[in-house]
């Protein structure tokens, strides 16, 4: 039996999230259907991070076990031939059985693209979040950065956890939150050991509330310490959220994600 790691991009706007569901309009269902058509047998996939409906991925990682022997590029080209245009494998890598897409990951990274202009932009519909402000108004990005600083380190993130979250522990380590201001756009990068269900979207809701001056930056620390979801802002829209990277031990040379063909081209190139 051979274990293969696969890298996946997808535009999540048209799908009901990653995880397989009875109606079968999920990324996992489309991917496993395509793999079955390529391999001639149903193969189950294990994913690094399950994404919600409307959430995208530039660096999703999965693994599967198979007796089929093919060159890595044959997996990419062959499976992609049966996938819808909004889902595509980017690479394939043979790994040993010690590799696990979910449990071996020690860091995950999400980006969020937020448009703050006075009107919608149809060309990025479904691919960016919105906080439409009147002409001349801007989010207070410095206040957002000050609020985000309270999130760094190991914390109980229960205040930002969805009620249906199945994680065994709400304690996670946030390594970095980087916020870039670019005209009508605000781009955010979150790096953590792992994320709870809806955690990034709930953090976004709070950061935007601070950016709109509804709360001071220290409010974020109060919400975090309160460990109560009711204290935080409403869950922000999924449209601008992207899973961009998953890190593994050096023994597994998983390719880094390439955001160059997305809204994030060049945005975080100089970020540590």
Swiss-Prot record:
GO biological process, one term: tRNA pseudouridine synthesis
Pfam families, alphabetized: PseudoU_synth_1 (PF01416)
Enzyme class name: isomerase
Gene3D superfamilies associated with the record: Pseudouridine synthase I, catalytic domain, C-terminal subdomain, Pseudouridine synthase I, catalytic domain, N-terminal subdomain
Annotated keywords: Isomerase, tRNA processing
Residues bound to substrate: 110
GO MF, one annotated term: RNA binding
Record-listed E.C. numbers: 5.4.99.12
Active site: 52 (nucleophile)
Reaction equation(s) it catalyzes: uridine(38/39/40) in tRNA = pseudouridine(38/39/40) in tRNA
InterPro entries given in the database record: PsdUridine_synth_cat_dom_sf (IPR020103), PsdUridine_synth_TruA (IPR001406), PsdUridine_synth_TruA_a/b_dom (IPR020097), PsdUridine_synth_TruA_C (IPR020095), TruA/RsuA/RluB/E/F_N (IPR020094)
NCBIfam families registered for this protein in UniProt: hisT_truA
Known function: Formation of pseudouridine at positions 38, 39 and 40 in the anticodon stem and loop of transfer RNAs.
Entry similarity comment: Belongs to the tRNA pseudouridine synthase TruA family.
Subunit structure of this chain's protein: Homodimer.
Protein name per UniProt: tRNA pseudouridine synthase A
Organism: Cupriavidus taiwanensis (strain DSM 17343 / BCRC 17206 / CCUG 44338 / CIP 107171 / LMG 19424 / R1)
Gene for this chain: truA
């Amino acid at each position: 039996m051979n274990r293969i790691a696969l890298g996946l991009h997808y535009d999540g706007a048209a799908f009901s999230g990653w995880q397989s569901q009875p109606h079968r309009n999920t990324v996992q269902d489309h991917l496993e259907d395509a793999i079955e058509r390529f391999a001639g047998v149903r193969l189950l996939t294990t994913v690094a991070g399950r994404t919600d409906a409307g959430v995208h991925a530039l660096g999703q990682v999965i693994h599967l076990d198979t007796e089929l022997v093919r060159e890595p590029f044959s997996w990419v080209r062959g499976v992609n031939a049966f996938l819808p245009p909004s889902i595509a494998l980017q690479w394939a890598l043979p790994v040993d059985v010690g590799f696990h897409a979910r449990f071996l990951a020690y860091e995950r990274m999400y980006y969020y693209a937020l448009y703050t202009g006075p009107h919608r932009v149809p060309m990025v519909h479904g691919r960016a979040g919105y906080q439409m402000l009147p002409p001349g108004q801007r989010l207070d990005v410095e206040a957002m950065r000050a609020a985000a600083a309270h999130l760094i380190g190991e914390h109980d993130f229960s205040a930002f956890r969805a009620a249906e979250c199945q994680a065994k522990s709400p304690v996670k380590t946030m390594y970095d939150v980087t916020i870039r201001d670019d005209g009508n756009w605000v781009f955010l990068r979150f790096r953590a050991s792992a994320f709870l269900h809806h955690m990034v979207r709930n953090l976004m809701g709070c950061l935007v509330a601070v950016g709109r001056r509804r709360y001071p930056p220290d409010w974020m620390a109060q919400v975090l310490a309160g460990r109560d979801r009711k204290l935080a802002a409403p869950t922000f829209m999924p449209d601008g959220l992207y899973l961009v990277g998953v890190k593994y031990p050096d023994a597994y040379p998983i390719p880094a994600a390439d955001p160059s063909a997305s809204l994030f081209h060049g945005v975080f190139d100089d970020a540590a």
